[in-house]
Regions:
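Extended glycan-interaction surfaces of carbohydrate-active proteins
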Residues: 88-146, 224-228
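An aromatic- and glycine-enriched ligand-binding surface/loop that stacks and positions planar moieties
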Residues: 1-99
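Selective for proline/serine-rich intrinsically disordered segments
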Residues: 6, 41, 90, 105, ...
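Long, intrinsically disordered, low-complexity segments
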Residues: 1-31, 128-129, 136, 143-153, ...
Length: 270
């Protein structure tokens, strides 16, 4: 079973930990709008940026769904955030071209992306926050308890996209486009035509719609595309080490040993 502490601990893994860094006014104290992320998991560049190119009015990419901006914190007085504009936060920053600058921010000022210059900045501290993994609600109203959104169990969009995939493989591109556009129309995204649709587009649409809900590996595995897509979009360590046989997972040895009526062969490569 689970209790009220399990999910906040899990969801903290997906949240950036900018609140812990002694930069731009943050001091390691969790605030209501920061949560208490530990950044154990960061989405890929493909997920954060690539699939949103030319997305137009797609509400799935709106700032309320994917928060891409960060702001200097308000001052904490007695555990309460106060809009004290007499405070100025001073942070030395070395830009990517080597220029040294001094960033001076008032509470509520935006922390500009060009000031995120270290690997630590972009990998753990200041990557976009997906509100599928967090809301502004906290257990018992305490910001250090993390963010706890409701989780979806069934999604009709998943059904449409599965059928679109089936239509495409059956040669019915018109039916596939219609199903994909049903999902996109709900999201206020621009509609597509048959010339734009292929299996990669359907996978992109699944990512936009079902991030954090579907098991992406299982989707790619049944398509026999784990190797191909990891090589194309995975981070360096994953792309360098993955092998074609990794499209399938190994069969547990206990399952092989317990199958007494016939020989159960291990998947190739394991």
């Amino acid at each position: 079973g689970t209790n009220k502490w399990d999910r906040p601990l899990f969801e903290r893994h997906f949240w950036p930990n900018f609140w812990q860094k002694a930069k731009f006014g943050y001091d390691g104290v969790a605030r209501d709008n920061t949560g208490r992320g530990v950044a154990f998991v960061r989405p890929t560049t493909y997920m954060i940026y690539d699939i949103w190119d030319n997305c137009g009015g797609d509400i799935r990419n709106s700032e309320v769904n994917i928060a891409r901006k960060f702001y200097a914190p308000y001052v904490l007085k007695g555990g309460v955030e106060v809009k004290d504009y007499d405070t100025t936060y001073v942070t030395p920053v070395v830009l990517t071209d080597g220029t040294e600058i001094e960033v001076r921010l008032k509470p509520g000022d935006e922390i500009k992306k060009e000031w995120w210059t270290s690997a630590s900045d972009t990998m753990t501290s200041y990557f976009p926050r997906f509100f599928k993994f967090g809301t502004d609600k906290h257990i018992d109203g305490k910001p250090d308890n993390g963010f706890v959104p409701d989780w979806y169990i069934f999604r009709v969009a998943d059904t449409y996209l599965l059928r679109a995939e089936a239509y495409l493989k059956a040669g019915n591109k018109g039916g596939a486009v219609k199903d994909v556009n049903t999902v996109r129309e709900r999201a206020k995204a621009s509609l597509i035509n048959e010339n734009q649709l292929d299996i990669d587009y359907i996978l992109d649409e699944r990512a936009r719609e079902l991030l954090g809900e579907e098991q992406r590996f299982m989707t790619l595995s049944r398509m026999n595309m784990v190797y191909q897509r990891t090589k194309k979009y995975g981070r360096n360590v994953s792309a360098a080490s993955i092998q074609e046989y990794n499209n399938l997972l190994p069969i547990p040895q206990s399952a092989i040993d317990s199958n007494l009526e016939a020989e159960l062969r291990q998947n190739e490569g394991y």
